[in-house]
């Protein structure tokens, strides 16, 4: 099994999403001892956001020399995603949605002809065979019956993005309400880590 591990929190060792994503990877390696893991830390080494120059190259323009390294980095993350059987993502909620670093990565893997295609006026996802497991951390509570539900643009966004490319049932493990109190933070982490142990092997 080829496993791609993505972290996007900027909090380093203080990050809950990193703690849970690491536990997920450890669990998968335990039940799949031969798994080959590729790790990308978007918080420590962020990708550049797409610009007009990137889009011009996608339309056939000759890339400027100063863009070459960035284009190579974008091609590398796309190939990492395409090669992976399972993708584990640590995704904290920042201002009601995903970190900007994770958005930059998503922009590099949503590529027509690679992860989705247009056919007959409809979109066809091309990544349907992959498994995606997302470790989510949120400071508050954003469930459907809560006052903050309208502000939930993390899990809902990621479900849509991966569904768009054919991965319609990502596994979500969430640690919610981690900013309410130190006690609740520990309880939320323990609950998430318990859910990790129940993950299916493959």
Swiss-Prot record:
The keyword Transmembrane helix does not apply. Its cofactor is FMN. Keywords: Flavoprotein, FMN, NAD, Oxidoreductase. Binds 1 FMN per subunit. It catalyses: 2 a quinone + NADH + H(+) = 2 a 1,4-benzosemiquinone + NAD(+); N,N-dimethyl-1,4-phenylenediamine + anthranilate + 2 NAD(+) = 2-(4-dimethylaminophenyl)diazenylbenzoate + 2 NADH + 2 H(+). SUPFAM superfamilies: Flavoproteins. It is an enzyme of class 1 (oxidoreductase). One of its GO terms (molecular function) is electron transfer activity. FMN binds at residues 9, 15-17, 93-96, 137-140. Its EC number is 1.6.5.-, 1.7.1.17. Disulfide bonds: none annotated. The keyword NAD applies. PANTHER family: FMN-DEPENDENT NADH-AZOREDUCTASE 1 (PTHR43741), FMN-DEPENDENT NADH:QUINONE OXIDOREDUCTASE (PTHR43741:SF4). Quinone reductase that provides resistance to thiol-specific stress caused by electrophilic quinones. Belongs to the azoreductase type 1 family. Homodimer. This is FMN-dependent NADH:quinone oxidoreductase. It comes from Rhodopseudomonas palustris (strain BisB18). The lineage of its organism: Bacteria, Pseudomonadati, Pseudomonadota, Alphaproteobacteria, Hyphomicrobiales.
């Amino acid at each position: 099994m080829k496993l791609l591990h993505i972290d996007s929190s900027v909090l380093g060792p203080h990050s809950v999403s990193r703690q849970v994503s690491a536990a997920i990877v450890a669990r998968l390696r335990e039940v799949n001892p031969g798994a080959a893991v590729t790790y990308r830390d978007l918080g420590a080494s962020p990708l550049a956001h797409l610009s007009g120059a990137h889009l011009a190259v996608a339309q056939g323009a000759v890339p400027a020399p100063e863009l070459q390294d960035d284009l190579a980095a974008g091609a590398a993350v796309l190939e990492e995603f395409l090669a992976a059987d399972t993708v584990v993502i640590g995704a904290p909620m920042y201002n009601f949605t995903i970190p900007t670093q994770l958005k930059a990565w998503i922009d590099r893997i949503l590529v027509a002809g690679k992860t989705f295609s247009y056919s007959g006026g409809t979109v066809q996802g091309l990544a349907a065979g992959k498994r995606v497991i997302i470790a989510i951390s949120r400071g508050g509570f954003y469930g459907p019956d809560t006052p903050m539900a309208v502000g939930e643009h993390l899990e809902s966004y990621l479900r849509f993005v991966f569904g768009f490319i054919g991965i319609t049932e990502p596994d979500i493990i969430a640690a919610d309400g981690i900013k309410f109190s130190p006690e609740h933070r520990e309880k939320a982490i323990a609950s998430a880590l318990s859910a990790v142990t129940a993950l299916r092997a493959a």
